[in-house]
From Swiss-Prot:
The lineage of its organism: Bacteria, Bacillati, Bacillota, Bacilli, Bacillales. Its EC number is 5.3.1.6. One of its GO terms (biological process) is D-ribose metabolic process. Catalyzes the reversible conversion of ribose-5-phosphate to ribulose 5-phosphate. It comes from Staphylococcus epidermidis (strain ATCC 35984 / DSM 28319 / BCRC 17069 / CCUG 31568 / BM 3577 / RP62A). It comes from the Bacteria. Keywords: Isomerase. It is an enzyme of class 5 (isomerase). This is Ribose-5-phosphate isomerase A. Homodimer. HAMAP family: Rib_5P_isom_A. Pathway: Carbohydrate degradation; pentose phosphate pathway; D-ribose 5-phosphate from D-ribulose 5-phosphate (non-oxidative stage): step 1/1.
């Protein structure tokens, strides 16, 4: 049986085939992207492509620059042709939960800018509903994070915890905290997103709703491609 890494590696050929010379691409954050970046760099070198990359995190930018990729700031581009990223959960409508790597705000900015957004996952990320297996990340200001957490818990049957990294609070590239919201039962994603995004102190939620154009899934039986219904 193939492990998660092997399943992700299976999908990368389908991703690379969508990269064309002259593109500006959005590059996500996380374990899947760490596998993909060296292959993008190799593609650029082998085919002598001119590719501009816009990264969703400082970590991704560092990895890409180490491989001599041309990386620019998001404010230096007018458009993004193709965004590529992983996801923590994917439902049947290709809605996502993202933010396990803590880069959800920048990921959403870049993914929404892109003409086409392609997601790469292994089959364990496919769920019946968002929040079924993975806590929803919410990026919040440090100033009132506790009040935001308690407001969420008072309103919904949700357990909220502030994310920590080696016993200290996790800090995003934007200087904020992440609240991980574990749903105790099914809550409609659009409803919960609207509630959360209007709380003072919330920058963004990890719900990526109606954004993905395609999800490439590595399964034990092979690669499965899911396309957004139009």
């Amino acid at each position: 049986m193939k492990d998660a890494k092997e399943l992700k590696l299976m999908t990368l050929e389908d991703v690379l085939s969508q990269i064309e010379n002259g593109m500006t691409i959005g590059i996500g954050t996380g374990s899947t992207i760490e596998l993909l970046i060296p292959q993008i760099a190799e593609l650029i070198q082998q085919k002598n492509y001119t590719i501009t990359g816009v990264c969703t995190s400082n970590k991704t930018a560092f990895l890409a620059k180490e491989l001599a990729m041309n990386i620019v700031d998001v404010n230096d581009v007018e458009k993004i042709d193709l965004a590529i990223d992983g996801a923590d959960e994917v439902d049947s409508a290709l809605n996502l939960i993202k933010g396990g790597g803590g880069a959800l705000f920048r990921e959403k900015v870049i993914d929404e800018m892109a003409d086409r957004f392609v997601v790469v996952v292994d089959e364990s990320k496919l769920v019946n509903y968002l929040g079924e297996t993975f806590a929803l990340p919410v990026e919040v200001d440090k100033f009132n994070w506790y009040q935001v957490a308690k407001k969420i818990e008072r309103t919904y049957d949700i357990h909220v915890s502030r994310r920590v990294n080696e016993d200290v609070p996790f800090i995003t590239d934007n200087g904020n905290y992440i609240l991980d919201c574990s749903l105790q039962n099914r809550i409609p994603a659009y409803e919960l997103h609207e509630f959360l995004i209007h709380l003072t102190g919330v920058l963004e939620t990890g719900y990526f709703l109606d954004i993905a154009d395609q999800v490439i899934v590595g399964t034990q039986e092979g690669v499965k491609i899911l396309n957004k219904e139009t």
